[in-house]
Amino acid sequence: MNPLAQPIIYSTIFAGTLITASSSHWFLTWVGLEMNMLAFIPVLTKKMNPRSTEAAIKYFLVQATASMILMMAILSNNLLSGQWTMANITNQYSSTMMLMALAMKLGMAPFHFWVPEVTQGTTLMSGLLLLTWQKLAPISIMYQIFPVVNVNILLAFSILSIMVGSWGGLNQTQLRKILAYSSITHVGWMMAVLPYNPDITIFNLIIYIVLTTTAFLALNLNSSTTTLLLSRSWNKLTWLLPLIPSTLLSLGGLPPLTGFLPKWLVIEELTKNGTLIIPTAMAIITLINLYFYMRLIYSTSITLLPTSNNVKMKWQFENTKPTFLLPTLMTLTTLLLPIAPLTFPTP
């Protein structure tokens, strides 16, 4: 990518998300989504190879299809109500079409098939943007239209996303695909609580962004894209090795780490609203998600090499520049739940 084009591309991505999140007019919302989509395609093809080109084409086709469905829903609602504002959605069919389009953009099941493939086909940092920043615009629309969304369909999408995200990551050895399936699971948790308490959805999104950013930055610092490369990271950056397991466990939602806090709030909110079976099923299914993170940790830090003679030891480690971002994120990843009683005092 041309260095002169990078500020323009990233500014357009930021502007598109900002326009969508701050607009109450459907046309401006759709324009912001299109700006965001078109500007993100060069980010996916930062490294020109057949795999990144394939990922960019898949991303474009899925997002264009979702935008077309969303525009059809907007126009049908306008024909029936005569309004362009997001608060005036009177047709149930239009709201269902909007929900399907936004679920496709978010990568929720059963529209999730593009997320692992696109994430695998791009770089780690581009995958980080795909799984974090690109969620903001669709979730901001969902936040505004949730009063008219069919709750049963949204809960079905959420539970299916948690199931697919948990089962899909079991047989993966590519770390980007594992994080992509983890993203599908987290989106399912966010959307499950949206009709009952949208503020918990926003809090869940913030925690998810912190956890995913920490994981991607740690893997990028190690240049680890597979479980095999991650298991050899002890010979590259020894100081990072003890921190990766805590990050992965927090991403899987193990108490008392930070990743359990949003799940705790979601389960509490759903239980208050009389849906005891749904949060119980969600918690049980998410244990599968925690299992393949435990498997990653086992292959990374618990197992020892059978013989040290077969491994080339580095006599000089890489001189990495010190950064305050990763240690700060690591602290938030592990210590936010223990201070939660101070942050969320009980009445």
Swiss-Prot record:
It is found in: Mitochondrion inner membrane. GO terms for molecular function: NADH dehydrogenase (ubiquinone) activity. It is an enzyme of class 7 (translocase). It comes from the Eukaryota. The chain crosses the membrane at residues 1-21, 25-45, 55-75, 96-116, 123-143, 145-165, 178-198, 200-220, 237-257, 274-294, 324-344. Pfam families: NADH_dehy_S2_C (PF06444), Proton_antipo_M (PF00361). It catalyses: a ubiquinone + NADH + 5 H(+)(in) = a ubiquinol + NAD(+) + 4 H(+)(out). Its main location: mitochondrion. GO terms for biological process: mitochondrial electron transport, NADH to ubiquinone; mitochondrial respiratory chain complex I assembly. Core subunit of respiratory chain NADH dehydrogenase (Complex I) which is composed of 45 different subunits. Interacts with TMEM242. Belongs to the complex I subunit 2 family. Core subunit of the mitochondrial membrane respiratory chain NADH dehydrogenase (Complex I) which catalyzes electron transfer from NADH through the respiratory chain, using ubiquinone as an electron acceptor. Essential for the catalytic activity and assembly of complex I. This is NADH-ubiquinone oxidoreductase chain 2. The gene is MT-ND2.
